[in-house]
Amino acid sequence: MDGDIAAALPPVNQQSKADGTAVAAAAAAAACHGDFEPSVWGDFFVTYTSPPSLSQEPEEQMRERANFLKGEVRKKFEAAAAMSAINSAMLVDAVVHLGIDHCFREEIATALRSVHKEEGEFGSCDDLHTVAVRFLVLRQHGLWVSADVFDKFRDDTGSLSKSLLCSNPRGLLSLYNAAHMVTPEEKVLDDAIAFARSHLEAMIGELRSPMVEQVSRSLDIPLPRFSRRLESMHYIAEYGQEEGHDAQILELARLEFELVRSLHLRELREICRWWRELYNDVKLPYARDRIVEIYFWACGVIHEEEMSRARMIFAKTFAFTSLIDDTCDVHATLEEVQKFNEAMQSWEEDAVSIVPEYLRTLYSRTIKGFQEFEDMLEPNEKYSMSYVKKAYKLLLQYYLKEATWANENHTPSFKEHVQVSIISSGLPMLVPVLLMGTGLATREAFEWADSAPDMVLASGEVGRFLNDMASYKLGKNKKDVANAHECYMKEYGATGEEAFAFIANMTENAWRKINQACMEMDPAMLPAFKVAVVDLSRSMEIIYLGGKRDAYTFGSNLKDLVTSLFLKPCA
C-alpha cells in the first residue's frame, strides 16, 4: 500500500531532501526575491481517489459498528466510575489521546467531576504516571489542580528524586507533558520540566517502541501543544502495544479516524477545486499556492465530522488572507496597499474602483467570499459576521502599518513591533472566524474576544514569535518589516542567538497565559475558546516546529505529514 501511495504522489521538491544548511540557504534566497516554492501537490487531490483497500468496508457498516462501540465505551465509563476515580482518569486520558473525546463529552464531564473531587484517592497514589495524568486531564479541561501533587516525588532537599523517577520513562514522560500545563509564576513546575527533559533525553537511545516515538514527539512539541488530530493518528498506531489497552476503544478510534478522513478527503477535493478557480481568476503568480497546507492546517484546528462548515470557512478565509498578505509583503507598493486597505475598510462592492487594477478581482472575490460565509449561517448566527469583519479590517490596518514601516525602512521598538505584529499574525482575526464557523459561541463570547483579552493576544504571540523565529533561522523577504529578532537586537545590542532565546521564552510565557486563561474562564465559554485559541495555537507549533521551520512557505516540509494524515491507512 505504501508503495502504491508513493508512486501516485507528486515528486518531492529536491530542497526537502537537502541538508539543513542548504535548506536555510535556499529559503533565504527564495525569500529575498519573493519567489515562493511552487505547490508540492498541484491538482493531486482534485483527481485523487482512495484505493479500495483504504476504504476497508462500506461506510454504512463502519458507522453501524462505530455506534455499537460507542455504546460499549459508555458502559466502560459507568464501570470505571463504580471502581475508582483513578480508573475514570485513565479512561478519559485514553479517549482524549485517541481523538474520540468528542463522542463522549457528557461522560467525560461527569468523570472529571469525580476525578477532581476525589483528591484523597490520588493523594495516596505513589505512581507518577497516574498522578501526572490526573493533573493533565483536569487542567486541560479547565479544572484547577495544584502542582503540590508532585511534592511526594521530591527528596529531602526539595528536588525531584532521581532514585524514584529515573528508571520510570513512562512516568517521566507523563510528568513532562503534564508540567507543560504550567501557568505564569508557577516556578515549581519549571524544575519538573527541566528534570524530566534531561532524563528523557539521556534515556531515549535505550527506549523501545512505542515509548521512543512518544518521547521523541513530546521533546519536539509537548503533548498539550501538539495537534490533537496528529496525535490521535500516531497514538492509534501505538496504543495497541501498551499493556492493558482496551481493544474496543482502539477499534472505535480506528473507525472514527477513517470515517472522518473520508470526509476530509471529500472536503479537500472540493476546496482544491475552489482554490484553483480562485487562483487562476485573481492572477497573482507571486502569491503562495498552498491550499493543501491550508486545509491540513484547518484539520489540525478542527477535525471533527460535525465541524465541516467551520473547516471550510476557516480554510477559505485563510486562503484569501494569504493572497492579501503576500501582496502586501512581496509585491504591492505602499500606495497600492493604502488603496486596497481603504476599500476593505468600506467593505463595499463598488469600492473596487479605488483598488489598483491588478487587485480588483482579489478584492471582489474576497467581499463575495465573506458574503457566502454569511449565507452559510443560521438566521440567529448572522450577527457574528460583524465581529469577523471588524477583526478582518483591523488586520488590514496592521498590514498597512507594517507596509509603511517597510517603505520607510523603519525599525520599530521591540514593544511597538510586538503590539502590531501579534495582530498582523492573523491569529486574533481567526479567533472570531472559528467562533462563527463552529457555532459554539454566544454573543457574550464574541464580545469577550473582541475586547482583545490576554488569551487571544497570547495566541497571536505564539503565532508571531514562532514565525519570527523561523524567519531568523531561514531568512526573510527583503520587503518585510524588521522582525522581532532584529528589533530586539537593535534596541538592546543583543546577538541573534540572545534575541532568539528571549523570543523563545516569550513564546513559552504566551502558552502559560493561555493555560491560565483556560482555568479562569467561564466553563460555558471554554469549549469554544479551546478550539478558537488553544487548538489554533497548537496548529502553529506544527507548522513552525518551535521556530525551526516554516512549513507553510516551504510546503515540502509538510509533505510527509500530509501524506500520513490523508493518504496512509490507519495503523
Swiss-Prot record:
GO terms for cellular component: cytoplasm. Binds 3 Mg(2+) or Mn(2+) ions per subunit. Induction: Accumulates strongly following fungal elicitation (e.g. Fusarium spp., C.heterostrophus, F.verticillioides, R.microsporus and A.parasiticus). It is an enzyme of class 4 (lyase). Its cofactor is Mg(2+); Mn(2+). GO terms for biological process: defense response to fungus; diterpenoid biosynthetic process; response to herbivore; terpenoid biosynthetic process. It catalyses: (2E,6E)-farnesyl diphosphate = (+)-beta-selinene + diphosphate. Mg(2+) 2 binds at residues 325, 329. Mg(2+) 3 binds at residues 467, 471. Substrate binds at residues 325, 329, 464, 467. Gene3D superfamilies: Farnesyl Diphosphate Synthase (1.10.600.10), Terpene synthase, N-terminal domain (1.50.10.130). Mg(2+) 1 binds at residues 325, 329. It is found in: Cytoplasm. PANTHER family: BETA-SELINENE SYNTHASE (PTHR31225:SF63), OS04G0344100 PROTEIN-RELATED (PTHR31225). Sesquiterpene cyclase that converts farnesyl diphosphate to the volatile beta-selinene and the corresponding nonvolatile antibiotic derivative beta-costic acid, especially in roots upon infection by rootworm larvae (D.balteata) and fungal pathogens (e.g. Fusarium spp.). Belongs to the terpene synthase family. This is Beta-selinene synthase.
